[in-house]
Amino acid sequence: MNNFDFNNRTAIITGGAQGFGLDIAKRFLDSGCKVIIWDIDEKLLKSTTEEINNPNLSYNIIDVSNFTQITKTVSEITSKTNIDILINNAGITGPTAPLWKYDVEMWNKIIQINLIGTFNCCRAIVPNMIENNYGRIVNVASVAGKDGNANASAYSSGKAGAIGLTKSLGKELADKNIAVNAVTPAGAKTRILDQMSKEHVQRMLSKVPRGRFLE
């Protein structure tokens, strides 16, 4: 496993109380980074931080679709330290249904979290990175954003939007020592699978040559 030196760096990880976000947080902590995990699930945040028990780990209860809440929290954080790294990992899958039967309210919720949430966090944090001439941003998208999954049009659209946002923002910040990238993982055994129907999970699995999800 590669070793990195993130001493004197501070990272914010959205959706950091479980799954990909939690594993990313642990790697950063192992590398000496100060980590702030953002999640909407207060109970899970508390149990996660208590279990890890690392003085470099803290959390905020954040709804990434709430820009006002984010800007207030960012202001409080940057009054004490810079934000060097942002991992936009928060996301939901929503129900599986064809577009013409998709619940409009749920469609909007998925876009608000998966796409607008990514924008909100970047919009609030990038000014601090520009001021300090340093930043690393990673947006967790999905292979669905490139391929488009049947019966998951909201999720696919939100992740496709996150990929486009990454490309645009990366070009805007290229001369400011701020790198912006996206990762597009396929299926992984996290709690997000619990939001999907068994039929949809099996359809995803059938596309994986090795017949298993990332663990």
Q: Where in the sequence are the language-model features?
A:
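Substrate-binding pocket helix/loop in short-chain dehydrogenase/reductase
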Residues: A97-L99, M106-N108, L193, H200-M204
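Alpha-helical segment proximal to the catalytic Tyr-Lys
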Residues: P127, K171-D175
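Active-site helix of classical SDR
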Residues: C122, G158, T166
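Catalytic Tyr-X3-Lys loop
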Residues: W100-F119, Y134, V138, A162, ...
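A conserved structural motif in NAD(P)-dependent oxidoreductases
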Residues: V208-E215
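Residue(s) in the substrate-gating loop at a strand-loop-helix junction
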Residues: S142
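Canonical Rossmann dinucleotide-binding motif of NAD(H)/NADP(H)-dependent dehydrogenases/reductases
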Residues: F4-V35
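Active-site loop immediately N-terminal to the catalytic Tyr-X3-Lys motif
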Residues: W100, D147-S153, D175-K176, G211
